Amino acid sequence: MFGVLNSSDHRAAVQQRNIPAFGRTSFELWTDSPTSNHRCETGGNGRDSGQNRVRRPMNAFMVWSRDHRRRVALENPQMQNSEISKQLGYQWKMLTEAEKWPFFEEAQRLQATHREKYPDYKYRPRRKALPQKSDKLLPAASSSTLCRQVLVDEKWYPFTYRDSCSRAAHPRMEDHLSSSQPVNIANSLLQQEHHYCSTSLRDSPETLAMHLSADPPF
């Protein structure tokens, strides 16, 4: 009897320990781990070095626009940040060299302090992501209306044809595009395409066999 009570008490104690864990959110459970506390303190994933998170020292324009940007944003809460930057850039250009000089001195002082604090600092700008090239062909310009009708892309032909006909006709079309006059390209190539397709379809293996069987022997 004593052993049964101990086992039931043990199960109740285990359930009491597990109930609060299920009632808490995943964010609370995540922040209890030591690795998560380290991430919260460092502000990242813990793998980045301090040099990667060091900001560049401000230049003269940044020193000057630090207070002016705040004032313009308060006066114009609906203005976007890009518009504020344009306005501040225009105002900065309108200042004289004498008016800019105190901000240049402050920027030099900040750069010297930054150099002493981070002697191994090197500015590493982020590379812009290159736009992915699309495999789809763009439509031709309006000035090449004639050539647009005879492009190699099969979807652009105004008539139907077989693959064997198109594969044999494409090299011929490319040769004519490089050597013939641009005025009569569309008409001549379309006529050649129709003629070649009609002859190739007419001279199929079955048709050739019929012709050979019908020819008289020598």
Swiss-Prot record:
It is found in: Nucleus speckle; Cytoplasm; Nucleus. Residues 54-122 bind DNA. GO terms for biological process: cell differentiation; male sex determination; sex differentiation. GO terms for molecular function: calmodulin binding; DNA-binding transcription activator activity, RNA polymerase II-specific; RNA polymerase II cis-regulatory region sequence-specific DNA binding. It comes from the Eukaryota. SMART domains: HMG (SM00398). The keyword Nucleus applies. SUPFAM superfamilies: HMG-box. One of its GO terms (cellular component) is nucleus. Interacts with CALM, EP300, HDAC3, KPNB1, ZNF208 isoform KRAB-O, PARP1, SLC9A3R2 and WT1. The interaction with EP300 modulates its DNA-binding activity. The interaction with KPNB1 is sensitive to dissociation by Ran in the GTP-bound form. Interaction with PARP1 impaired its DNA-binding activity. Belongs to the SRY family. Transcriptional regulator that controls a genetic switch in male development. It is necessary and sufficient for initiating male sex determination by directing the development of supporting cell precursors (pre-Sertoli cells) as Sertoli rather than granulosa cells. Involved in different aspects of gene regulation including promoter activation or repression. Binds to the DNA consensus sequence 5'-[AT]AACAA[AT]-3'. SRY HMG box recognizes DNA by partial intercalation in the minor groove and promotes DNA bending. Also involved in pre-mRNA splicing. This is Sex-determining region Y protein.
